[in-house]
Amino acid sequence: MEFSVRTIINNKVYINGENLLHAMCRHGNSLALSIIAQSINKNYQYLLNEYNREGRKCIHIAAVMHKGQVATELIIILLNFGADVNGRVLCTGDTVLHIAVYLKDYYLAEWLCRRSGININARNICRTHTISNSTEEKR
C-alpha cells in the first residue's frame, strides 16, 4: 500500500483528537508543514481551521507550542494557505494575538500587529471575575 499525504488527508487520520496539520504545528516542523500545506487543495482547506479536542486551530497550536521565529514561520505558512488569523480558541475566545501576549512572545505579537487583517481589538472571554472570586475564597 502506497503511503501518501493524500491518503492521510482523505482517510482523516486523527491522533489524539488532532488532524495531520495539528500534529505538524505541534512538532514545529515548518518544512514538513509547508510540503503538506502545499498539497492541500480547496477541498481540504478546512483542515487548517478545524478545531482539535482542546478547541484550538492549527494557528493556536503553533503559538502555544513554539515561540519567536519558529512560531512565526509556522503561522506564515498557515496564513499563506488560508488559516484565519483572527480565529478563536473555543473555550476562551483567544486569538493568536491573545496567546502571543499572554505567553510573552513579543516577537510574534509585534509581527502579528504589523499584519493586515489582524483584529487588535478582539476581545476574549473575560476571566477577571473568576480570578477575583478565587482570590476572595482563599481569604
From Swiss-Prot:
Suppresses the host immune response through NF-kappa-B inactivation. Possesses ankyrin repeat domain required for NF-kappa-B binding but lack the regulatory regions required for dissociation from NF-kappa-B and degradation. Therefore, prevents host NF-kappa-B release and subsequent activation. Keywords: ANK repeat, Host-virus interaction, Inhibition of host NF-kappa-B by virus, Repeat. This is I-Kappa-B like protein N1. It comes from Microplitis demolitor bracovirus (isolate Webb) (MdBV). It comes from the Viruses. GO terms for molecular function: NF-kappaB binding. ANK repeats lie at residues 16-48, 54-87, 92-122. InterPro entries: Ankyrin_rpt, Ankyrin_rpt-contain_sf, NF-kappa-B_inhibitor. GO terms for biological process: cellular response to tumor necrosis factor; symbiont-mediated suppression of host NF-kappaB cascade; toll-like receptor 4 signaling pathway. The lineage of its organism: Viruses, Viruses incertae sedis, Polydnaviriformidae, Bracoviriform, Microplitis demolitor bracovirus. Signal peptide: none annotated. It holds the Pfam family Ank_2. Belongs to the polydnaviridae I-Kappa-B-like protein family.
